A protein has these predicted regions:
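A generic, well-ordered mixed alpha/beta core segment in the N-terminal half of proteins
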Residues: 70, 74-133
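N-terminal low-complexity or amphipathic/hydrophobic leaders
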Residues: 28-79
């Protein structure tokens, strides 16, 4: 049995909240730089130039990449042989988010009640997804989600007889309706299967996969390629599509 003090979790969550809002992952930076070189449109080239400059300024001045620093979404995998000591794990996570957003000078947007609209002042509470695994390891991923893109999310309950082409067409139609609202270039996560909440979770989790990786299952990798091609024909800058079926969600 491995013991971990919850203060370590608090500190790590705090650091990740700041880092995730100031720096893009290396694979995403490389993807943007590659797309910037290959972009043919003069307008597109100017947009990519602004994005690259924004990344540089954020890194050099230690300020957020975007003014919308989002809701903190936390994916946490806990080994079943881990015992947390020193207090409440839930409180530690919330304290970590609060410290990250206040000490990192990040915008606090979360309200205590959706109808009363009273800001909590520290961007808590976060959305936390817990997964129990074997062993003694703990993995924490913080993925701030801004609502410019979150508000463009959609879910459709389809019948078992739905075809792959119908799934692709629906995803393309969602992107077409969203247009420029989610601030292109965009990364698209697609969940397939499960129930209402599971499918939405899969779509959110798919966004955490490296943009340099494709689905390990050939059928879904081909589906990704088909979506990518059709969505790019819309003229909306797209970096990646990532469908995640239920049985390969952790790949």
């Amino acid at each position: 049995m491995r013991e971990i003090n919850v203060s370590e979790v608090e500190e790590l969550v705090r650091d990740l909240c700041i880092k995730a809002n100031l720096y893009l992952p290396e694979d995403m930076e490389s993807c943007i730089e590659c797309n910037a070189r290959e972009e043919q449109s003069p307008v597109g080239k100017n947009v990519f130039a602004d994005i690259l400059d924004n990344m540089r300024v954020a890194r050099e001045e230690t300020i957020p990449i975007c003014q919308d620093t989002g809701m903190a979404v936390i994916f946490m995998t806990i080994g079943q042989d881990v015992h947390f000591v020193g207090g409440s794990l839930n409180e530690a996570i919330n304290k970590g988010v609060a410290r990250g957003y206040t000490e990192g000078r990040l915008r606090c947007s979360i309200v205590s009640d959706p109808l009363e609209r009273v800001n909590t002042g520290d961007n808590t509470p976060p959305v936390v997804h817990l997964k129990i695994a074997e062993g003694e390891k703990v993995e924490i991923m913080v993925a701030p989600k801004g609502f410019g893109s979150e508000n463009m999310s959609q879910l459709k309950m389809m019948t078992p007889s739905v075809t792959e082409d119908e799934i692709v067409d629906w995803v393309v139609s969602v992107c077409a309706k969203a247009g420029s609202n989610p601030c292109p270039p965009i990364v698209i996560g697609v969940g397939i299967g499960g129930d209402f909440e599971k499918c939405a979770y899969l779509a959110k989790k798919a966004l955490c996969r490296s943009v340099s990786k494709r689905n390990p299952k050939e059928r879904y990798a081909k589906l990704e390629a088909k979506m990518l091609e059709k969505i790019n024909l819309l003229g909306i800058c797209l970096l990646y599509t990532s469908p995640s079926p239920r049985d390969v969600e952790e790949s």
